[in-house]
Amino acid sequence: ATQDSFLSVVLKYRCQILFTTRSNLNEYCTFQLKEIQDINILFQLTSAFYSEADKYRSTVEKIIETVHYHTFAVELAAKLLENGISTPGQLLAKLQEERASRDNEDKIKIIKDGQSSKATYYSHIHTLFSLYALSRKQQDIMCNLCFLPYTGISARIFAKWLELPTLNEINDLIETGFVQTTTRHTISLHPMIKEIALSETKPSVSSCHILLDSLQKICLMHGMEVAYYKKLFQTIGNIIELIEKDDIPKYLLFLENAFPYMDNYNHHKGMNGIIQELTGLLKTKNIGTDSDRALLLDFQATLETKPEKAIKLEKDALAQIETITADNARLVSNLHANLGGLYRMNGHPDLAREHM
C-alpha cells in the first residue's frame, strides 16, 4: 500500500510512543487500541463535557449505544447537548433516525489533531473519518463495501467482485483505518463508517453495476457451488435493503437471477426477501414487464406449501404472457414445465403431460 509522505519524517523524531490509525507497522512493537466497550467509562467521558449527564443518564447511555461507543462521537454528542438547543431525548431520536444527524444545525467547536473548527455534528464525523480525502477509486470501494455483512468477507473475493487488479487500494483503506480486517484477511466496515459511507457515496444500481454484474454471474452458474454462499446471500440481502434503485430493469434482472441460485441452497429467507421486493416494485403498473410479473408468480409458487395454490400461481404466471415471442419463449417453456411437474407430483399425470 502507498506510504504516507510524512510517516518517515515523524519516525525520525525518535518518538517513544506514536499514536496512529495505521495498522500495518510490523517492524515495530505495536499495541492495538480498540473501542471502549465499558459504558460507565464512556458515561464519565460524557459527564466531562455535559454538565447534566447524571440527570439524563438513561438517555445518555442510549446515545452512547447509538453511536456505537465511538469516543469521538460520544464527545461530540456531549458537547452538542451542553451547548446546543437539543434535549437528550431529541438528540437520541435524531441519531436513531439519521445516526450521523445531518439536520442538526447547532454549531459546536472541536479540536482534533491540534486544529480547531466549527461544524455540525454530522460534519465533525465526516472530518474525523476524512472520507473526502479518499481517491475516487477508494470512494467507489467504500461505496460497495457498504453491502458486505458485518462479519466481513475475504479481501480477495471482494476484489474479484469489483474486478480490482490488485489489493493495493483496499490495503490503503485498511492502513488508514477505514476498513477493518482480521488475521484471516477478512474485511468489513465499522457500523458508523458504514453509515457515513452510505450517506456520502449513495450506492445505486448504476454506480455499483460492476458488483451487481459479478454477483449475477455467480448466480447464473447453475450447478456450481461457492463455499461463501452464505456471505453472498447476505450481501444480496444488504443490496436489496440499501441500494438506490436508479435502473429498475437492471435491478429486476439482478433479483430474478439471484432467486433461483438461492433456491439451490434452500435459502428461504433470501428468497422471501426477493419476493417481497419484487412485489413492492411491480405494484406500480409502469414498472416491469409481463415476464417480470410472471416470474414473480413463479417464485411465489416455488415457496408455496399448498399444492393447489402453487398450481394456481403457475397458471396465473402463464396467463400474464399473452403472446409468445423470442424474448419470453424460454420463460414460457419453464413455466409449463413447472406446472407439469406440480401436476405430476400431485397425481395428475394426464394434466402433467399437457405441459411437459
Model regions: which residues?
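A conserved switch/coupling segment of P-loop NTPase cores
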Residues: A1-Y50
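Loop-to-helix "switch" segment enriched in basic
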Residues: L42, L80-Q138
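C-terminal boundary/linker of central alpha/beta nucleotide-binding cores
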Residues: E75-E82, I125-T201, C208-H209
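Amphipathic alpha-helical segments of tetratricopeptide repeats
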Residues: T279-T284, D316-T323
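Amphipathic alpha-helical segments of the small helical/lid subdomains adjacent to P-loop NTPase cores
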Residues: L33-L76, Q90, N168
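Extended alpha-helical scaffolding segments used for macromolecular assembly and cargo binding
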Residues: S207-L295, K309
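Conserved alpha-helical positions within TPR/SEL1-like repeat arrays
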Residues: E256, P260-D263, D292-T305, R330-M345
